[in-house]
């Protein structure tokens, strides 16, 4: 396999962690972009075929919706449907839950199970062991780029997978002492920011930071 075309010809589709979509185009336009066909496209048929895939597997997607108005999970759905539309029977997803909320993860897993039950092969690349145990039937372990082994998920635990990944037993218990200085150092109330396009990148964010602690801020990349 030397190119994405070779993968498509073999029925393999890759969904990358960072999406490759054109924001000003619709879902349907992104899905068919680059495909060979007639000089005049029958968009009515394209929408019909996409909607059949959406209904078949339980996706949340409107083929006519512009990408720039979509949530992150909907953009991911466009990428998945794009691969299905092009005939992929083997789907490889790179860190698919890294940009999703817990509810969106549940929805994604339901769709992936539907595709599995329909006979498609699903490969997920992830570091999240709890999700591996929840979704997969088998799990293959890599360490420093080398294949270590494969287990039936029913026989695996977080501890056993961690040991295979690291190469030694690892304690998963972390004891953190309470900070001595609980003096409030910073207060942020309802901060809102826009980017150069005028779209909100922060909206009504509030938090407090205290001395002697590390405050983690979690969010989607970008």
Placement of each model-derived feature along the sequence:
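Glycine-rich phosphate-binding loops of nucleotide-dependent enzymes
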Residues: 1-222
